[in-house]
Amino acid sequence: MPVLAILKDKSCEAAQVKLNALGATLAFVDASRIESFAQALAGAETAISCMASGNLHVDSIDDFWAIDRDANIRFGLEAVRAGAKHVILVATFEGRDSRRLTEFSDAKECAVDAIGAACRQAGVAFTVIRPTAYFSDLTNRAFDSVLKRGRYTVIGDGSHRINPVDGDDVAAFIADCIDDPRMADSEHQVGGPDIFTFRAIGLLAAEVIGLPGPLKIRAIPLWLLRLVAALATIVGLVSQRSRRSAAILRWMIYSGSHDAIGVSCGTGRLCDDFRSKRDGQIRVASLRNEAITLDRDPGSGRHQL
């Protein structure tokens, strides 16, 4: 089956290389214009959107209203117009439960509602995939924090549970939804095979890294986050940036105080992902040391880097 990967920017070269290696054709679109999707989606039988705002510190053209809501709606509506038989949207795990508490969740749920309505009207299958949290999210936050600072942060007491999932396993699950009509036209909350508390994730990272001393765990009280969110909400009456920050804080409060356990899919394990990241760091350090040795100037004793 030919695959066309639609990207909204060219900033991530690693993703482009990986997609090309898998045999996908790449198309770049302006996510702010519905016309931009028309050519890319022409003739598509199945359209899958994983679009989400890149990180928590974004401006108005790349925040959750612009991407999670508006860009996804443009994509979904154009996919239906283009004649797709199946539209798949990757959404947040807790979105339906937390949308009334935070605009961060409501943004993606607005896309779920709008695309779902368009698909029902057109007789198109609509599937929603809700992963708990990707390994990459935890690697970038937990692992890197423990590795660089020997410190780890939890919201509340860190006792709430989650079964994070490998992105490759989610991709395989989506492929199953395409191949098996019984899995289509449904919502799926998916996670990985292992359940952790948020505190245990930091301890796992410390164990894999081989942290020489005890891990410093900093617990941020929920009351403090609620206070900051309330202040940001007030300032948000006159500042879009503060309104955005308040929404993200309320989402963090919800996510950090509720379990997120999805149906186990795949075989990828967080401990193996952490070990892979650790081994990668060791290889980089080894190559750097070799480069210093090879480039040493014997005359001056200085490194030519």
Q: What do the predicted segments below correspond to?
A:
Residues 51, 88-92, 130-132:
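Active-site beta-alpha turn of Rossmann-fold NAD(P)-dependent dehydrogenases/reductases
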Residues 65-69, 88, 108:
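Short alpha-helix in the Rossmann-fold core of NAD(P)-dependent oxidoreductases
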Residues 1, 6, 12-15, 82, ...:
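Oxidoreductase cofactor-interface core, primarily capturing Rossmann-like NAD(P)-dependent enzymes
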Residues 46-48, 85-89, 127:
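Conserved catalytic-site loops of classical short-chain dehydrogenases/reductases
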Residues 47, 170, 174, 190, ...:
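Non-catalytic, hydrophobic alpha-helical segments
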Residues 205-256:
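Terminal hydrophobic/aromatic helix or amphipathic segment near a protein terminus
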Residues 256-305:
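Amphipathic terminal alpha-helices
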Residues 8-81, 96-98:
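NAD(P)H-binding glycine-rich loop region in Rossmannoid oxidoreductase-like domains
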